[in-house]
Amino acid sequence: MSMPATPPTRRPCRPSVPVRPARGPSARAVACRTTIPFGRDNDGTPVSWDLSAGRHLLIRRDERRSSPSVSLDLIAMTTLTGGTHDLVVVDPHRRHRWLGGSASLPTGPCCWATTADQITGVVAELDSPVVGPPRVLLVADLAATVAALDDEGRTRLARVAVDAREHQLLLVATTADTNPRWYPEGLIDAFDDIVARRREERPSFGLR
């Protein structure tokens, strides 16, 4: 699909959400080559994800009961150091605090939303018809994010996911339950790949 002709423009986040400029394109080629490993599937095939593939990824895991996801941290760092995409983080459990303003980071996410008001504001901005720069939306617990939104916000979130490519947006999210019945219509189906851990704790990789 061809990219929209609208020139990229940075749109501000809500004042309550930390805002920092994105890094320049000096590490663009490195970011495109970097792959994030997820172990092996049930057939022994290595499972990985990379930024340049442009595929929306959903990881089945419980953010409330698990330690912070190393894979999410790697995806965030790859995005931050690559210079090809801005990073927007929705983190309702505040599991990835280092993204919220670590002084040691040379740059940080465009937005780090943790409260219901902040999440609502981020979703509203992403649903805007104005096309911004390429972005990665990293959601640490999709179910909790949906629960934080009202009906209008949930409808907007589903629309953001369905129309993501038209807005140069790449989705990466975790959730404890991938059953579409618990989510706004079209939200789960918008993800291309789903990584799920079965009882034997071996990752499986589903292509959508």
Regions of interest found by a model, annotated:
Residues 1-23:
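Interdomain "pre-motor" coupling segment immediately N-terminal to P-loop NTPase/helicase cores
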Residues 8-11, 203-208:
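Generic recognition of long tandem-repeat/solenoid scaffolds
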Residues 19-195, 199, 205-207:
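P-loop NTPase catalytic phosphate-binding loop
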